[in-house]
Amino acid sequence: METFPILIRKDGMPIRYLVVDDSVFARKNVAKMVEAFGGEIVGEAGDGCTAITEYDRTTPDMVLMDITMPQMEGIEAAERIVRSHPTARIVMVSSVGYQENIVAALQKGARHFVQKPVKSEILYEVIKYVMGDDAAVATPTAQES
């Protein structure tokens, strides 16, 4: 896997993620990527209902969420999370790249969209963009060099 500069919050702590996808493989793949970026997985969910519960429980810095899932789809879950937490950062990660789905997700509060299969360099740049001024690239210490 390609290496990337570590992304951290402005307070020096790791960016905390909630990863939501009904595919365990997809969740693990995305989790592996964000951990390589220096992130911390604080929760996982396989459907929109569980995503809402996990968001309330973990208050992550960012949610990476699939669109098509059982019980409640990602767009509806994103809308409900943003309604309760207006500053929530949600990035939709889906193979369903129809323009109407992307537009609907953005209208309901998602901040960005990443097409599956996820490319780590694209996910990294999207995370940097969505975190904005609340994130920084960690400067290596002498021990890490």
Residue ranges and their predicted role:
Residues 24-43:
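Two-component/phosphorelay signaling modules centered on CheY-like receiver
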Residues 47-50, 73-76:
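Acidic catalytic/metal-coordinating carboxylates
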Residues 58-64:
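Active-site beta3 strand of CheY-like receiver
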Residues 69:
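Receiver (REC) domain active-site loop signature in two-component systems and cognate sites
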Residues 96-97:
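Short, conserved "switch-loop" micro-motifs in signal-transduction and mechanochemical regulators
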Residues 100, 118-127:
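C-terminal output helix
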